[in-house]
Amino acid sequence: MSVEKQSFGTTKKGEAISLYTVTNKNGMVMKVTDFGAILVSVLVPDKNGVLTDVVLGYDHGEDYQVNTPHFGATIGRNGNRIENASFVLNGKMIQLTPNENGNNLHSGPDGFEFMMWEAESKEQAIAFRHHSPDGEQGFPGNFDVTVTYTLTDDNAVEIHYEGISDQDTVANMTNHSYFNLGGHDSGNVYEQTLQLNATTYTPVSDSKSIPTGELAPVAGTPMDFTEPKAIGKEIDADFEQLQMTGGYDHNFVLDKPEGAFDWMAKAYCEKTGIAMEAYTDCPAVQFYAANFLNNEKGKNGAVYDKRHAFCLESQYCPNAVNDTHFAQPFLKAGEKYDTKTVYRFLVK
């Protein structure tokens, strides 16, 4: 196991950005940066032993300061959408910044992904720390948060989120990596298969993607990934939910006890033989098929387009702060926020 640190550019404020490269005993490589606590690269040996970068991203830290698609981003304090960019907490209306169709998406334009984090290098892990002051993004409470990326010797990237606030607040963090198991520059993911540990999903009310509040069964619909299925098989089906969102961009409620750590998704690319198993203790996962990627210039000259990747964002249900049907993402003052999501890679 080795860890290397190198320059990765400069922020608009003149701060030095660093890139940390962790390599395990199998030759698998994980690259993360202290700008946004972002996952930059995951290089996995394919069935022929060729190192293959399976996450989309950019070559330079400067590029991540725009990062409209949220490549590899640590999202916080809240992932996904909050209707009307507002909610009530302890009888008080909390107003956030609307940044998508009048709603708040991924905590707004000043999300954690656009901030410098303090980095600490460990034997096989990089820990990133951030102090989020009371009122940052509109959320109450001083929130001290740590995100630790660990590369294990069984070829897993573990992401551990920890935090504590001095006031009741919202804590619903996630990682927005875009995966392509054929390689980040290999084109669309239509032929790659996906299986989700979910028999229900949360339908959205319209193209603004706020859930209706109901849990709908996936059975008999294109939303059924209870068995491995090619991502492209039904993505353009004549199905209202898919037409509203331009393809898969939906929250699936995981079939497991609340708080239990269990598998959420399994994906596979026959071309490379690379498989990925994802695990979490969160109640749900957003499956997004990169429907809105368009001519995005990425790593090593790659150009990323529509459906060239997929995201599996562990989370509380979208807009849960405004919908008591769902598990609530509120963190009590003085209590510890502690959640883990793991992406493990293997060859089949």
Task: List each model region and its residues.
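An exposed, glycine/acidic-rich loop-and-rim segment of catalytic or binding clefts
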Residues: M1-K348
